Amino acid sequence: MSIKMRTMLPIALIGLLLLAACGESTPTPEPTERPLASFDFEDVCRRGTIDRAPAYEPEAGSGRIHPVVVFKRDTADDSYLDLSPSSFELPIPWMVDYGGDFGTVELVVCMTGIESTLAEDCAYEDDDDNEEYMLHVYETTYEVKVYAAHSGEELGSTTVKAEFEACPMFHMFSDKEEDSYVYPPVSPVQEFLQEYVEP
């Protein structure tokens, strides 16, 4: 065997090994699903479903809690706002707080303002520039519906009236005049939800 042949043989073997290594593909890892967040459940208010939510299977007298997320909109033309436990104070175990595990949520509560009446014009003054601002506050009747998150089934509905008590102590204005709708009262909503959340 010539010297030329001896040097070419190792080079050829290296080439074959490189080709073999290139042929072994590393499996691509499956993308990790993002954990559910509160805003994902808004679809249920629009008659959608959440496949990743656990099925709602109530057992009377079990003492088991079926967690909820709560949404509100002032009129049917508005976007839904998800309410945190600090802004809508249902019993603590009922709602998942921000940063909690929304993968446990079984129920979605959707509140929509269906009738509003002007209750008070609240005047405010900016201490810095003495500009005057006006807040028109409306008493509102809300339609409250509760859905099973996984199936999208409507489980029940009721109406509650949010009544005016006093002008807010302060308000963050974007315009010189704005409308504001009284928040739905917690107590009647809690009474309505009791049989679904804690049967």
Across the structure, where does each feature detected by a protein language model lie?
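Bacterial N-terminal signal peptides that target proteins for export
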Residues: 2-11
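C-terminal motif of bacterial Sec signal peptides marking the signal peptidase cleavage site
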Residues: 18-21
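Bacterial signal peptide processing site
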Residues: 23-25
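Compositionally biased, intrinsically disordered linkers/stalks adjacent to structured regions
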Residues: 31-102, 158, 164-199
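Surface-exposed short loop/turn segments
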Residues: 101-149
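Well-ordered beta-strand positions in beta-sheet-rich domains
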Residues: 141, 157-159
